[in-house]
Curated annotation (Swiss-Prot):
Keyword Metal-binding in record: yes
Chain residue numbers at which the record places covalent cross-link Glycyl lysine isopeptide (Lys-Gly) (interchain with G-Cter in ubiquitin): 388
Motif LXXL motif 2: positions: 115-119
Cell compartments where the protein resides: Nucleus; Cytoplasm
Name of this protein: Progesterone receptor
UniProt record similarity statement: Belongs to the nuclear hormone receptor family.
Amino acid composition bias (Low complexity), ranges on this chain: 17-28, 232-246, 335-356, 434-452
Segments for region (Mediates transcriptional transrepression): 165-305
Biased composition (Pro residues): 418-433
Amino acid sequence: MTELKAKGXRAPHVAGSPSSPKVXSPLPCRQAAXPFPGSQTSDTLPEVSALPISLDGLLFPRICQGQDPPDEKTQDQQSLSDVEGAYSRVEATRGAGGSSSRPPEKDSGLLDSVLDTLWAPSGPGQSQPSPPACEVTSSWCLFGPELPEDPPGTSATQRVLSRLMSRSGGKAGDSSGMAAAHKVLPRGLSPSRQLLLPTTGSPHWSGAPVKPSPQSAALEVEEEDGSESEDSAGPLLKGKPRALGGAAAGGGAAAVPPGAXAGGIALVPKEDSCFSAPRVALVEQDAPMAPGRSPLATTVTDFIHVPILPLSHALLAARTRQLLEDESYDGGAGAASAFAPPRSSPSASSTPVPGGDFPDCAYAPDAEPKDDAYPVYGDFQPPALKIKEEEEGAEASARSPRSYLVAGASPAAFPDFPLGPPPPLPPRAPPSRPGEAAVTAAPASASVSSASSSGSTLECILYKAEGAPPQQGPFAPPPCKAPGAGGCLLPRDSLPSTSASAAATAAGAAPALYPALGLNGLPQLGYQAAVLKEGLPQVYPPYLNYLRPDSEASQSPQYSFESLPQKICLICGDEASGCHYGVLTCGSCKVFFKRAMEGQHNYLCAGRNDCIVDKIRRKNCPACRLRKCCQAGMVLGGRKFKKFNKVRVMRALDAVALPQPVGIPNENQALSQRFTFSPNQDIQLIPPLINLLLSIEPDVIYAGHDHTKPDTSSSLLTSLNQLGERQLLSVVKWSKSLPGFRNLHIDDQITLIQYSWMSLMVFGLGWRSYKHVSGQMLYFAPDLILNEQRMKESSFYSLCLTMWQIPQEFVKLQVSQEEFLCMKVLLLLNTIPLEGLRSQTQFEEMRSSYIRELIKAIGLRQKGVVPSSQRFYQLTKLLDNLHDLVKQLHLYCLNTFIQSRALSVEFPEMMSEVIAAQLPKILAGMVKPLLFHKK
């Protein structure tokens, strides 16, 4: 035995592993024949007896000729030294003086090369078969240290594999052991020429033992700058794995000292600390084995990945076992694709990949793959590679196949077998998580709006499925293209839902009476029944007339600001024959109104004065029909048009006011132009847009207050909240019929309603109190009227006094209905976010148009420039004062909402969403009020 000293050891030892000054290692004789020819150098090594290579009689059963067989005990120990010490790497640097010896480094190159040689088929670009072990010309030149004795009763092969299994994956003092396992393979090497070492991110074979930290040694990284041989197969890759070149890759290269052979590659890596510290070998019964598999196969498959071989026994056994043990896999599909080529193959064929570059669909990841980056079974892709997800189409599916899940399947339950061109993606099964709805397959790049999450219910009602196609525009929703999805999907930017009932609905509630509404894959939102009349609960009987079905809603005329109204009767929806008695009506409604007014009939409604008046049912209830005619503004003395003449209508509109942009109230010249009247015009024509506002005005809404019980603070507040919820639905429905409002972006529509709903409610309260009780009481609803005595008895008397100011102002100013309607629309448009709206231009045009309509409404009663300008100032000043008044209501409402449990006050769902999301924003000054006058 001869001592071999390494000069200038660079790599540090493992902590706790002592460095012996001398390590004896058996050195076999140096052979001058192939497969490692080299030039003679001055550095000669002492010749010692060659050692037999035996892997427990598995690989090479015979020993070299001319050698005496050692005794059994010596041979067993030497076999351990040979197998584990083979390919030992000695760190040597060229230095002048001083030498220190250390234990040479161990490597798993022999086992990798032997298994590669044993399993890889011969062919172009493949590894060459290893020469016979008994030939002198191609014998293995091995040297390595002596290993500590192992526990008796364990075979040499099992002890070696147990040690290889129990190694750590990193070097001493190096925290990047895991990262080393994911290094990129060098270009020019096919996957079949490399053994794929498992990492923590790689999957395990079914039935194989899973260790707590399965870290295996990765390919050694060469970090030297320029120490490479001229005849080497390839340059050293800086910071990349070193490839075995030349004959070393084919027949298993032997580690040769530096300078011994000119044609070979002297591997001078860092020290591998996986063999520096003593270890305890695993006994056979310690390692769990899969049933029907030998201990060797179980241990080897747990240690390495099987290379890409189409007919390898290990691959066939693994695939067969996988299909037998995987319960969730379908038998028919498994029989068809059980032995399909692995995913790492660039094509779906089973032809071995020749040596060369990797396909362009594979690239090196920037970071380590996640633990769930690969499926549990059937993935032979190298851990350092991942497939590009940007490829699309059938060609990309064939190159980078992915398993498509069926309904109710889990992503981890299927092996990743290659498939052909994918079929159309089926709709996803109904999920089990709350808040998630069944949707059809959509592109992953679909953007989701980041607006407030409280507008979900409003959005559901604003964009419900209608019979008529929606108005096309820059923000119009595209039509549905999912006939088999079971629901109407609107693929547009939408808001997430926060309601609890929506989660229950998505989790498996009974189907609604109309197609399920899911916006951009979001769950079905609350208050679905409020969209259609048929699904409305019984608690809303007075509101049934207003919530018409979609078939009736689609008959409503669509108006624009600069265009004339359509030929549709504003009373029954039939085709209009002209403007009769100041309103665009049909001939039937004209005759009915004339006879009813001239005959002075007292009609009584058999219902609740909320009957539906349309083309079919207009003769059912004359009382409701006459009431609707009066609400639309029909007057016996009004001007009549025998025919629907556009020219005469335009002349009548020009006589009322000129369509010029609105200006500041003190601009007398502009106001004089707008309020120019014909001297002989006795009766003014109501503008068509104001007539439309009259026709879309909501009907009476009841609070449902129980008068049989004494009034308490909680009962009154709960009744007011229920009334507010119904009025909020009424505001949404009214805004949808408002000309110009649907031209705004859906997010802007939701924002405007959320900011102005309280102003609209208190403004409507003031109008009802002014019209019905002359401002003496608060007329919340026909069944909830508070006089001054009931106000004092309530707990919100100060709040009632604040709201009472509005009807008193109406009484003082004697506001007309036309003025009220225009002011109501301006209240909807009087608060915007600080950053503005998405469709700010359309919003400003809409607001300017309704300001002009307010001026027209003022001109119907005021004659002259000065009275008209004064009237305009008074009405707009009232609108500005409403900001401060409504702010007090917001503060009280938010405090009551926070203390609702303690006060036993119930808040409905939609109102709760709006209060929780928008009131803190409004009270914090994060909105911009639009004022007519400076404070």
